């Protein structure tokens, strides 16, 4: 249970102090000084306990006690010390020597506690409002960034799809087999040896689509322009080597057609027929020296004008006409 309070003893007075009791206490302390509170009631004759004498001196009678309202600095000190020390009012009063612990406790319970509660409520509301505004701004920012990211993602996906389609198209174009841009349909004349074969031998050349290649593949018509182009291309691309006999025979027949533009229609049919006859190839094999000499002359010439000069040379012209007349007779028979 602990020891009983000293005020409960028999003959000990309780209640408020009288002015006479205050004068006796102050006179004794001025003579002997504060301290040894247990001997004060015995030496002074006061019917008070030692604790009551100490509190009366400390809280009311000692010199330097400040009365009246608390300043702002004192309020801040009390709030700070109460937060650190709690309700230890005597320890708090030691930091404020002009204020008593009883005055500090009473002021705390009547004023500062309510004021602190209001301050905390206002701070909480301000913090909550700030957090709400911050959350709202963050949510708006996140929404905006999400929308922008979605839009940028959509643009990126469309760009990626376009790049993929372009890459696939380029790959297909690269892997596809080149198709001739100028499809040419032609028919080779009948190589029969009947009497009507020479009269029914025709060459049909049909060219569709636009002519983008200056030297299109296919069979040329018997014209001087096409023959000149073929010979010019042959001079640029063909290396200086011996030409195979079939190619030489074909070139020989083409030069014959170009050198005799004034021949009759019947002669033209015979020449066209000789282009595709095997007799011309056989005769070319029988005359390799002459053909090689002509082809080498064709290759060594530097321009088309020199070739034309050689083409219309009288001796070469007579030789080619004689050969072609022999070939025409063999085809007819």
Swiss-Prot record:
A Pfam family this chain is assigned to: Myb_DNA-binding
Ranges of compositional bias, category Low complexity: 196-209
Listed Gene3D superfamilies: Homeodomain-like
SUPFAM superfamilies referenced in this protein's UniProt entry, alphabetically: Homeodomain-like
Protein name: Transcription factor MYB94
Molecular-function GO terms, alphabetical: DNA-binding transcription factor activity; sequence-specific DNA binding; transcription cis-regulatory region binding
Tissue expression from the record: Expressed in germinating seeds, rosette and cauline leaves, flower buds, open flowers, stems and developing siliques.
Natural source organism: Arabidopsis thaliana (Mouse-ear cress)
GO CC terms: nucleus
UniProt KW keywords: Activator, DNA-binding, Nucleus, Repeat, Stress response, Transcription, Transcription regulation
Span list, region Disordered: 134-157, 183-218
């Amino acid at each position: 249970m602990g020891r009983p309070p000293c005020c409960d003893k028999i003959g000990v007075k309780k209640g408020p102090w009288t002015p006479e009791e205050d004068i006796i206490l102050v006179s004794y302390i001025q003579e002997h000084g504060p301290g040894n509170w247990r001997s004060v009631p015995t030496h002074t004759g006061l019917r008070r306990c030692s604790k009551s004498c100490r509190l009366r001196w400390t809280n009311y009678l000692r010199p330097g006690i400040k009365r009246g309202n608390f300043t702002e600095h004192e309020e801040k000190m009390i709030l700070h010390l109460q937060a650190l020390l709690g309700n230890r009012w005597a320890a708090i009063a030691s930091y404020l020597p002009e204020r008593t612990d009883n005055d500090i406790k009473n002021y705390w319970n009547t004023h500062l506690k309510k004021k602190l509660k209001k301050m905390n409520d206002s701070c909480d509301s301000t913090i909550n409002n700030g957090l709400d505004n911050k959350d709202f701004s963050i949510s708006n920012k996140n929404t905006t960034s999400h929308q922008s990211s979605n839009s940028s993602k959509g643009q990126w996906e469309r760009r990626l799809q376009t790049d993929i389609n372009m890459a696939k198209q380029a790959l297909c174009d690269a892997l596809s087999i080149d198709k001739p841009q100028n499809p040419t349909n032609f028919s080779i004349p009948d190589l029969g040896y009947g009497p009507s074969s020479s009269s029914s031998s025709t060459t049909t050349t049909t060219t569709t689509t636009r002519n983008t290649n200056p030297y299109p593949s296919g069979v040329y018509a018997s014209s001087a322009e096409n023959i000149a182009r073929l010979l010019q291309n042959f001079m640029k691309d063909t290396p200086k080597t011996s030409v195979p006999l079939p190619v030489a025979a074909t070139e020989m027949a083409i030069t014959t057609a170009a050198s005799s533009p004034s021949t009759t229609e019947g002669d033209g049919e015979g020449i066209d027929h000789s282009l595709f006859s095997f007799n011309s190839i056989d005769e070319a094999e029988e005359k390799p020296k002459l053909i090689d000499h002509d082809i080498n002359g064709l290759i060594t010439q530097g321009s088309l004008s020199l070739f034309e000069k050689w083409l219309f040379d009288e001796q070469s012209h007579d030789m080619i006409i004689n050969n072609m007349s022999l070939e025409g007779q063999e085809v007819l028979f």
